[in-house]
Amino acid sequence: NTVSSFQDILMRMSKMQLGSSSEDLNGMIIRLESLKLYRDSLGEAVMRMGDLHSLQSRNEKWREQLSQKFEEIRWLIEEVRHRLKNTENSFEQITFMQALQLLLEVEQEIRT
């Protein structure tokens, strides 16, 4: 379940944040939270309307928003990969591996 995965990863990152003064991590958490909200609202809109095409035609900014989210996801994926390479801490490694897997799932989900 991606919702619980988001919650779990955000909680783990918050714990990591306490141990460091990294602004990058803070930015990552903020973007992940924003992505979660976007994904949730997109899912609700599709379910409510029952048809993705009517959502697309109703909202011209929809495509623009979508490409912006893909940019954010790509940034997050790169950031997470970078962190993963540079950490020796197993708690952080597990957290970033989970985050990477989740981001790839969400990217695939939004794409389809």
From Swiss-Prot:
One of its GO terms (biological process) is exit of virus from host cell nucleus through nuclear pore. It is found in: Virion; Host nucleus. GO terms for cellular component: host cell nucleus; virion component. A motif (Nuclear export signal) lies at residues 9-18, 82-91. Its main location: virion. The keyword rRNA-binding does not apply. The keyword Transport applies. Disulfide bonds: none annotated. Pfam families: Flu_NS2. Keywords: Host nucleus, Host-virus interaction, Transport, Virion. SUPFAM superfamilies: Nonstructural protein ns2, Nep, M1-binding domain. Binds M1 protein. May interact with human nucleoporin RAB/HRB and exportin XPO1/CRM1. Belongs to the influenza viruses NEP family. Mediates the nuclear export of encapsidated genomic RNAs (ribonucleoproteins, RNPs). Acts as an adapter between viral RNPs complexes and the nuclear export machinery of the cell. Possesses no intrinsic RNA-binding activity, but includes a C-terminal M1-binding domain. This domain is believed to allow recognition of RNPs to which the M1 protein is bound. This is Nuclear export protein. It comes from Influenza A virus (strain A/Equine/Tennessee/5/1986 H3N8).
